[in-house]
Swiss-Prot record:
Keywords linked to the UniProt accession: Membrane, Nucleus, Transmembrane, Transmembrane helix
Lineage, highest ranks first: Eukaryota, Metazoa, Chordata, Craniata, Vertebrata
Superkingdom classification of source: Eukaryota
Name of the gene this protein is made from: NRM
Topology feature Perinuclear space, residues: 29-58, 115-133, 211-216
Entry keyword annotation includes Magnesium: no
Assigned protein family: Belongs to the nurim family.
Annotated source species: Homo sapiens (Human)
Membrane topology field: Multi-pass membrane protein
GO cellular component: membrane; nuclear envelope; nuclear inner membrane; nuclear membrane
Transmembrane segments: 5-28, 59-80, 98-114, 134-164, 192-210, 217-234
UniProt main location, coarse: nucleus
Protein name (record): Nurim
InterPro entries: Nurim-like
Subcellular location: Nucleus inner membrane
Nuclear side: 1-4, 81-97, 165-191, 235-262
Length: 262
């Protein structure tokens, strides 16, 4: 096991990489489609229909490239989450296992964003061009994206963000407190095993609610939606636990403070 002084910088480096990747992901999924990062070539008349696009190599080639990037990300994200791989990385990296997973996920996502191929001449599922839709639809999408990202950041902070990023494991190890998940209740551990992506609805809003849903954006939204759907396995027991925790937190928030009590 590496000395504690080496564990802390490694965990912090992984967190900084993940944070920077998250900022870049906001730009990739929200700012670029909403604020017009990629100029279109020739307008809607230059776009092809869906049947013609399936026979055009200039569209199929970048589409296949983008598909490969997404499969690379999904494969890394799923493979490193497998129990055997987690056991192997825990054996050789110890408390840095989660930090390693986060860093590799951030690097895979960086590859997707950096080498993504837009398809400006491909067919679109919908496009807001005529007034008043050309003004109000982008504005509505922008508002929904802002709300979704605020909810995502809020949920991550509440959902033990330090443990998800691997910081808490190193912190507890340095202080000799053991594994942070070992201190959680069995019901909480069961929930975490079923729901390691606690921002599904908000992320789906970001992926699908855009003024123009082109070919490459449709591929991105569809595959990530499919992956998020398959990654969740909530049942009635999990929902009852979530409901009980929400009621407990609301009860604590509704209790008067000591200074306000009569």
């Amino acid at each position: 096991m590496a000395p504690a002084l080496l564990l802390i910088p490694a965990a912090l480096a992984s967190f900084i990489l993940a944070f920077g990747t998250g900022v870049e992901f906001v730009r990739f999924t929200s700012l670029r489609p909403l604020l017009g990062g990629i100029p279109e070539s020739g307008g809607p008349d230059a776009r092809q229909g869906w049947l013609a696009a399936l026979q055009d190599r200039s569209i199929l080639a970048p589409l296949a490239w983008d598909l490969g990037l997404l499969l690379l990300f999904v494969g890394q994200h799923s493979l490193m989450a497998a129990e055997r791989v987690k056991a192997w990385t825990s054996r050789y990296f110890g408390v840095l296992q989660r930090s390693l997973y986060v860093a590799c996920t951030a690097l895979a996502l960086q590859l997707v964003m950096r080498y993504w191929e837009p398809i400006p001449k491909g067919p679109v599922l919908w496009e807001a061009r005529a007034e008043p839709w050309a003004t109000w639809v982008p504005l509505l999408c922008f508002v929904l994206h802002v709300i979704s990202w605020l909810l995502i950041f809020s949920i991550l902070l509440v959902f033990d963000y330090a443990e998800l990023m691997g910081l808490k494991q190193v912190y507890y190890h340095v202080l000799g407190l053991g594994e942070p998940l070992a201190l959680k209740s069995p019901r909480a551990l069961r929930l975490f095993s079923h729901l390691r992506h606690p921002v599904c609805v908000e992320l789906l809003t970001v992926l699908w609610v855009v003024p123009t849903l082109g070919t490459d954006r449709l591929l991105l939204a569809f595959l990530l939606t499919l992956y998020l759907g398959l990654a969740h396995g909530l049942d009635q027991q999990d929902l009852r636990y979530l409901r009980a925790q929400l009621q407990r937190k609301l009860h604590l928030l509704s209790r008067p403070q000591d200074g306000e009590a009569e």
